Design a protein with these regions (language model features):
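Short internal beta-strands
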Residues: 44, 68-71
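Pre-active-site segment of Zn-dependent metallo-hydrolases
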Residues: 12-52, 57-64
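Extreme N-terminal starter segment of soluble prokaryotic enzymes
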Residues: 1-6
Length: 71
């Protein structure tokens, strides 16, 4: 089974295990390097490495929209 890592920008990554997608440090809308919008993200879980704004900027709207648990 292959795991696909996709760098979105800044510290934001999508990790696709083939069984689900993990979003790491959701920071899209204020990120000058983000290659997509937070509204376009589909994920099964969200991992936040720490509480700085540039790692949690879009956490709440994405978690609410997707229902993904936050770790």
């Amino acid at each position: 089974m292959a795991i696909t890592l996709t760098w979105i920008g800044h510290a934001t990554w999508l990790v696709d295990t083939g069984h689900g997608v993990l979003l790491v440090d959701p920071f899209f809308e204020e990120s000058p390097t983000a290659c997509m919008k937070g509204a376009d993200v589909a994920c099964d879980a969200i991992l936040v490495t720490h509480g700085h704004a540039d790692h949690v900027g879009d956490l709440v709207p994405i978690a609410r929209r997707t229902g993904a648990p936050v770790y």
